[in-house]
A protein has these predicted regions:
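Positively charged n-region of N-terminal signal peptides that target proteins for export
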Residues: 1-4
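Ankyrin-repeat boundary/"N-cap" motif
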Residues: 20-29, 50-63, 85-95, 119-131, ...
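Solenoidal tandem-repeat scaffolds enriched in leucines and small polar residues
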Residues: 134-263, 268-271
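Eukaryotic tandem repeat interaction scaffolds
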Residues: 236-426
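Ankyrin repeat A-helix N-terminal signature
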Residues: 31-33, 61-68, 96-102, 129-137, ...
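Leucine-rich solenoid repeat scaffolds
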Residues: 451, 456-488
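Ankyrin repeat domain, specifically the short helix-to-loop turn at the C-terminus of the second helix
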Residues: 39-47, 73-82, 107-115, 142-151, ...
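N-terminal leader/linker segments that initiate helical-solenoid repeat arrays
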Residues: 6, 16-80, 85-88, 472, ...
């Protein structure tokens, strides 16, 4: 008995270590551990190639938290790591090193064969990624240029590196270096947007004044850039007043997607005064972007009830639909808080609207995440009490069970039982929820649960396939040796 307990304790300890890899904790790297410390962590069972849920692996965590060069080199050489490994947002180590301004590491990664033209999931090369996030060290740029990247290369929409980095280049030292490489402060992108416009996103009035003194022309696009702000900060009211009242830009300017300043700032923190300023300057909250979204639709996708109320008071029709047939209530159900959902309904938002992708129930199911299960339940209760027929099939015959099984979450399916949905309903392809679950299941839990609430395993799809037939083609079940005999 003692032996069994001891073995179980060892297994539990190993499991917990696997779940809490110390090298995936940013605080570990902030202590700047040397190679000996890292080796010690590896010896304890911490995997140097492991990644967290966001796909930040140990190496990218080390780079982003300023670990020393030798330690990072050691980690890159560990099994499972390489300079071509993709991490968070499809970025490779060269992306992170460039953004961090780690010149020695950038040179090392270039020497090791990193792809300098490799784009991440957002379409950014390593140098463009670094420039866009404010890296202004000329040595980083010089390393890429020395390795073959052309200084005058055009990126997305004709942007140059100078345009991307200008807003963070407070003393224009990087700009001075880049102009020596053939770039110019007079460069514009494919839409005619200038260095002034790009710099406006950082909201540095002194820099903007300096650029004007150097002959850089502002355009109305500067306001749109300013309203987007940066990843780390929002533009303040003083900057907007400077752009509108001194530079004389039009407050009702629109971006390339038809959006106004309000579309961009509505979900940022502490914007009430700025929102009122633009409304007073004539910006109409009812203006829609190219997808048909008005400002209320954007605002409703947050938990900021005050902002929703502020915009709703100026919105002509709370039931305006966008190109997908969605109203502001759809956004609230999918992304907003239960309080926002309730408020919109109280203000007359219709609950019986059907968008191209389904009714409010479908949108709610699509938004489900285990960590937000309580909010999900609240919103499910709100819409069910306000006229949404959650048991009715969608236009293609699918029910919420069909949608729900794709989440592979037992708790979600259990929350749907009280809705009295027909678990054996077949869609236009004659597929039941059990059929769909058989295709996407990662284990047998969901499949067995559906059977327990009455799913019929003998029903067939339009191609004469049973749930067993479909499950037998599920590679995940096969690879994990999950028995599906219970579906026969």
């Amino acid at each position: 008995m003692k032996k069994i307990f001891f073995t179980a304790a060892i297994l539990l300890t190993s499991f917990l270590q696997a779940q809490t890899n110390t090298m995936l904790n940013g605080d570990f790297w902030k202590k700047n551990p040397d190679i000996s410390v890292v080796k010690g962590e590896i010896a304890k069972g911490n995997n140097p190639a492991e990644a967290n849920r966001g796909n930040h692996d140990v190496v990218s965590m080390a780079i982003n938290n300023g670990a020393n060069f030798e330690t990072i080199k050691f980690l890159i050489d560990q099994p499972g790591n390489s300079v071509t490994k993709n991490t968070h947002d499809g970025r490779q180590y060269i992306h992170w090193a460039a953004n961090k301004g780690n010149v020695a590491l950038v040179n090392y990664l270039i020497q090791k064969g990193s792809d300098l033209n490799r784009t991440d999931d957002k379409g950014a090369t390593p140098l463009a990624f670094a420039a866009g996030l404010g890296q202004t060290n000329p040595e980083i740029y010089n390393a890429f240029f020395a390795a073959g990247i052309q200084p005058k290369q055009k990126y997305s929409n004709g942007e140059t590196i100078l345009l991307m980095a200008i807003g963070s280049d407070k003393d224009l030292k990087l700009t001075e270096y880049l102009t020596s490489k053939g770039l110019s402060l007079k460069d514009v992108d494919a839409s005619g947007r200038t260095a002034f416009d790009y710099a406006a996103k950082n909201g540095n009035i002194e820099l903007l004044k300096t650029l004007i003194s150097k002959g850089v022309k502002p355009t109305n696009a500067a306001l749109i850039f300013a309203s987007k702000g940066t990843r780390f900060a929002s533009t303040n009211l003083d900057t907007y007043k400077y752009l509108i009242e001194e530079v004389k830009l039009s407050p009702v300017s629109k971006g390339e997607n038809g959006e106004t300043v309000l579309h961009n700032i509505i979900n940022k923190k502490d914007q009430k005064e700025i929102i009122n300023y633009f409304i007073e300057k004539g910006v109409d909250v009812n203006t829609v972007d190219k997808d048909g979204n008005n400002v209320l639709m954007i605002a409703s996708g947050s938990a900021n009830l005050d902002a929703v109320k502020q915009i709703a008071a100026k919105t002509k029709d709370i039931n305006t639909v966008n190109a997908k047939g969605e109203t502001a209530l759809f956004t609230a159900v999918q992304k907003g808080s239960p309080e926002v959902v309730s408020y919109l309904i109280e203000k007359g938002a219709k609950t019986n609207v059907k968008a191209k992708d389904g009714n409010l129930g479908v949108y709610l199911i699509h938004s489900y995440k285990k960590e937000n299960a309580n909010e999900f339940s609240e919103k499910l209760s709100i819409i069910s009490k306000n006229g949404v027929n959650l048991s009715a099939p969608q236009a293609d015959g699918s029910t919420l069970y069909h949608t729900g099984v794709t989440k592979n979450d037992l708790g979600l399916l259990k929350s749907l039982v009280a809705l009295n949905i027909d678990v054996n309903a077949q869609n236009e392809d004659n597929m039941t929820a059990l059929h769909r679950a058989a295709l996407v299941a990662k284990d047998d839990v969901i499949l067995k649960y559906l059977l327990s609430i009455g799913a019929k395993k003998e029903l067939k799809t339009e191609f004469d396939e049973t749930a067993y037939d479909l499950a037998s083609e599920n590679e995940t079940l096969t690879e994990n040796n999950i028995s599906i005999d219970f579906l026969k």
